[in-house]
């Protein structure tokens, strides 16, 4: 089959979209990193949060390595634990309004998932433990939305737990 029949040449609009994405990547990454640090600090201080696992926080065991290898820009993907276990984590996820309930990473939009009730729901507590997933774990992928909106959504969802 000749190459010309496989669609190897993208349209001008698709080329423009790719170029826009590449040109704005640094700005989006900076915003994600900035938002992630603020969200992690907010969660760390919240009374309904049991723990936060984010290498961007100074008390994380790998913080120095993250600073060294990532140039101080720790990505926006991290986990935290909602007090109350599996049911609390599921209720929290269901209450989110701005965060999209999606198992993905690295988007401009903020995403959340509660593995014990989604990707790992078929596992019993012992199997979850073997897989390294706690029942209260929520995974966040932070996006570029305004930080006040992100924190407001997390706050209202935690209030429903």
Predicted regions: what is each one?
Residues 1-77, 81-110:
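Active-site C-terminal subdomain of aminotransferase-like
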């Amino acid at each position: 089959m000749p190459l010309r029949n496989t669609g190897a040449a993208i349209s001008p609009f698709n080329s423009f979209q790719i170029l826009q994405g590449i040109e704005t990547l640094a700005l989006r990454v900076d915003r994600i990193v900035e938002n992630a640090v603020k969200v992690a600090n907010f969660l760390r201080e919240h009374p309904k949060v049991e723990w936060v696992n984010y290498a961007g926080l100074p008390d994380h065991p790998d913080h120095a390595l993250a600073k060294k290898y990532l140039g101080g820009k720790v990505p926006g993907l991290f986990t935290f634990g909602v007090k109350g276990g599996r049911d609390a984590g599921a209720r929290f996820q269901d209450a989110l309004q701005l965060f999209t309930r999606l198992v993905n990473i690295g988007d401009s939009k903020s995403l959340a998932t509660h593995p014990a009730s989604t990707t790992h729901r078929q596992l019993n507590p012992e199997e979850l433990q073997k897989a390294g997933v706690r029942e209260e774990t929520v995974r966040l992928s932070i996006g570029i939305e305004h930080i006040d909106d992100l924190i407001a959504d997390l706050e209202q969802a935690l209030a429903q737990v």
